[in-house]
Amino acid sequence: MTSTLFFKPRPSSTLAEIAALTKAELIDPSQGDRVITGIASLDEAGPMHLGFFENLNYVAELEQTCAGACLVTQRHESRVPSHVAVLRVKSPVRAFVTYARHIHEDAMRPMSGFRSVGIAPSAVIHATARLEDGVIVDPLAVIGPEVEIGAGSVIGAGSVIASGVKIGRDCNVGANTTIQFALIGNNVLIHPGCHIGQDGFRFIFAQTHQKVPQVGRVIIQNDVEIGSGTTVDRGGLRDTVIGEGTKIDNQVQVGHNVTIGRHCVIAAQCGLAGSLTLGDNVALGAKVGVNNHVTIGDGAQITAMSAVKDSVPAGERWGGFFAKPTKQWFREIIAVERLLRSGAGAAPKSDDGKDGERG
């Protein structure tokens, strides 16, 4: 539920205004002056809320909703209760997001946790650091020597920006984040508790496990978003690179020397081992593990909880443990299930009729 305690209320909108913004058709134009004050899910919506319907799993919620208006496809508009104004649109969820972004700009990026303006008195900023106009630094943040931070950026409480780091304009660094040995572009969102630029896990394994110096950097290009608790190791010799527009979920590990292409999507708890390469527009489901030194080609997709030990060609869908093309993986699963149902997979019987021992 949207709370005015956390998100500032925006001016109300008429249904005619919403239809124009979302490129929807208001089925009953006489309701064009009807006022909507917010958004909500169908089961929580009231008469002043806008909702949307797209998934048949939520038919019951639609039939019982108290929403004032609903975005819906032509195919499903007959399911909308008579008291709910109908906004016909090709993609209800996209239209809903368009309106949500319009009225809740404050929810698009993490802002100052203290609603601060300027630099908090308890922040520590080195004399050689250079901050452009409009930078916000929350309490107890530390900005090191030779750091550069662009206009409109926000540094959250308790964060540490180490010596020489460059952060572009309109960036947000969440509370309790550490950044070192990194160059960061514009409009980058780093959520709370991230650690970027620490050395990678690289040793010459012997009785004493000799540590290998990691002297590379982390390069984060424009419009990247990094979820809470994610760690990005700096490169050993070459840089760790996260490409433009890539979105990374919470608790992802990015190893040293990893190269992630543009506009990739990486879901929670993925582990990317050192020196691997993701092409552009790659999608990894949650808890995917990728082996070191492999390449996943442009546009490839990996199913959640898969383990990738071999390179994946561009545009293919792989899954499983170990990952393989999904059609092959599904065929193997079906074959095993058939064997089990037929009894072919049962343990052999010994001469006395008891199950044979398994070594």
UniProtKB/Swiss-Prot annotation:
<dbReference type="InterPro" id="IPR011004">
    <property type="entry name" value="Trimer_LpxA-like_sf"/>
</dbReference>
<keyword id="KW-0444">Lipid biosynthesis</keyword>
<dbReference type="InterPro" id="IPR001451">
    <property type="entry name" value="Hexapep"/>
</dbReference>
<comment type="pathway">
    <text>Bacterial outer membrane biogenesis; LPS lipid A biosynthesis.</text>
</comment>
<dbReference type="InterPro" id="IPR020573">
    <property type="entry name" value="UDP_GlcNAc_AcTrfase_non-rep"/>
</dbReference>
<dbReference type="GO" id="GO:0016410">
    <property type="term" value="F:N-acyltransferase activity"/>
</dbReference>
<dbReference type="InterPro" id="IPR018357">
    <property type="entry name" value="Hexapep_transf_CS"/>
</dbReference>
<keyword id="KW-0443">Lipid metabolism</keyword>
<feature type="active site" description="Proton acceptor">
    <location>
        <position position="256"/>
    </location>
</feature>
<keyword id="KW-0012">Acyltransferase</keyword>
<dbReference type="Pfam" id="PF04613">
    <property type="entry name" value="LpxD"/>
</dbReference>
<dbReference type="InterPro" id="IPR007691">
    <property type="entry name" value="LpxD"/>
</dbReference>
<keyword id="KW-0441">Lipid A biosynthesis</keyword>
<keyword id="KW-0808">Transferase</keyword>
<dbReference type="Pfam" id="PF00132">
    <property type="entry name" value="Hexapep"/>
</dbReference>
<comment type="similarity">
    <text>Belongs to the transferase hexapeptide repeat family. LpxD subfamily.</text>
</comment>
<dbReference type="GO" id="GO:0009245">
    <property type="term" value="P:lipid A biosynthetic process"/>
</dbReference>
<comment type="subunit">
    <text>Homotrimer.</text>
</comment>
<keyword id="KW-0677">Repeat</keyword>
<dbReference type="GO" id="GO:0016020">
    <property type="term" value="C:membrane"/>
</dbReference>
<protein>
    <recommendedName>
        <fullName>UDP-3-O-acylglucosamine N-acyltransferase</fullName>
        <ecNumber>2.3.1.191</ecNumber>
    </recommendedName>
</protein>
<comment type="function">
    <text>Catalyzes the N-acylation of UDP-3-O-acylglucosamine using 3-hydroxyacyl-ACP as the acyl donor. Is involved in the biosynthesis of lipid A, a phosphorylated glycolipid that anchors the lipopolysaccharide to the outer membrane of the cell.</text>
</comment>
<dbReference type="Pfam" id="PF14602">
    <property type="entry name" value="Hexapep_2"/>
</dbReference>
